[in-house]
Structure formats: structure tokens, C-alpha cells
Amino acid sequence: MKQYLALALAALLLVGTLASCVQADPNAIDDYTPDIDYMVDEAGNTFYFEETEGEGAILVKYVGKSTKDDRVKIPARFVVESQGIDRTVVGIGASAFYGKASIVAVEIPATVTSIGTQAFAGCTNLTSITFPNGMLSVGSQAFANCDKLATVSFGQSLESVGDHAFWHCTALTAVTFPETLKTIGEGAFYHCTALASVNFPAGLESVGTLAFCNCLSLPEGVEDTIPATAKKGDFLFVIDEELLTTEAVTDPAEEPAE
């Protein structure tokens, strides 16, 4: 059993390691393409946006004025009157808030439908998050290492939770998925040690390998509540302290995504 688990861990974490090797620093504005512009809100916070096809925009970077207790309100529209820009904010891009330890709260507008890779990874003082009802997907490692994140409201339309999305969210106590959820990625809630309650909607189609591995507070028999029709990865709820504290287990969110 341990040999198979070790192999699964190695394969899963190798993917994250390889991805990290090619990721750029989101703090380097020079990496951004020329079609990115910014707006400043009334509080003096700067939001950088990338225009999408149609009339949409994706938030790709945030620079806040506050150095602590920062409460972010993401605008629903990207407006630069001097340039004639007025677009709907439809997504939060990769690493947009990566490592922003000053952030304690984020308000996401109803217009947003997706959260990108590592968008809030390492926001170590973020305590709760509420997704709008139109949210469809949460990207890989989106909230990895948000170790004070205690509550998450998933809205009513969510379809997918990406790989390692809530990796090491050790304060998270309960997860209630909407009936629309289809997929839970690999290691999505890995080492959420306080997680004591989770529901699986009837329409769930797949749960990835190690999705709830080392969730020490989950009750026995929780795996039996996954719909019989759902495809299940290996070692979903395995708890093995000796194996999981070896050097082979590395953090998939150590480097910011591009």
C-alpha cells in the first residue's frame, strides 16, 4: 500500500514541480503584454487588466496601498475614461493576488466566472471567500497555502475545482458543493486537516487522486458518500503521517504562475 501511495504522490507532485520551473514572476510588470492596462480605485489601489475577446477583461495583477488588513473589492467593470475603455470583469487571472499576505478579505463581483491558477495562493491572512453564483471554475492551486481560510461559499453554478486548489488550507472546516459541480481535481483539498464535513452532489463525475488525502478530521465512511457513477482517483482519503512528511512531498505553490 505504501509503495503505491509513494508512487502516486511522486507522480502527482512532479507535475506541479515541472510547471513551477517555467513560471514567471507575477510582480514583473515587464512580463506583461502591451494590451494590459490599469485602473486605480478611490482608495488608491491599482488593478491591472488584460482585455479579452468581446467586451470582457481579466484581472491579472493587484497592487494595494494597505500593508495589512487589506479588504479588496474587485471592480465589476474595467473603466479608463481617457482611453474609452469600459469592459466587464469576467475573470481573475493567474497569480493576480499571489502571496499578498496583507489581504484579509476579498469581494468578488457577480460578473466573474473563473479564478485562475494560483490566483490567491499564499494569501496567508485571507479568512473567508464567497464565490458569486455565476462562478464556473476554480483553477489549480488557486487558494493553496491559505492557511487561515476557514470558510468558502461556492455559489450555485460551480462546475470544477482544479488540482491542488485548496492545498494545505488547514483552517477550512466544512465544504458544501453546489449541485452543479462535476469535477474535483487531484489533491484539491490535500492536507486540509480541520476539514470535518464535505458533501458530494449527485451529478459529480470525477474526484482526482489524493483529493482529500490527509484530511485528518473527516469521518470514517465519507468515501461511501461519493456517487457510485463518479470516477474516483486513488488514495482519496488516505492518512499516513510517516509517508506524508517525507521530503518527497513538496508544496505545489512554491513558485507563482505566469
What do the PLM-derived regions correspond to, one by one?
Residues 94-96, 116-119, 139-142, 162-167, ...:
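Consensus positions within tandem repeat domains that build extended binding/scaffold surfaces
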Residues 59-64, 71-72, 95-97:
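Short, surface-exposed, low-complexity cationic segments
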Residues 1-10:
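Positively charged n-region of N-terminal signal peptides that target proteins for export
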Residues 9, 13-17:
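Hydrophobic core
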Residues 37-64:
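GGW-centered surface loops in extracellular recognition modules
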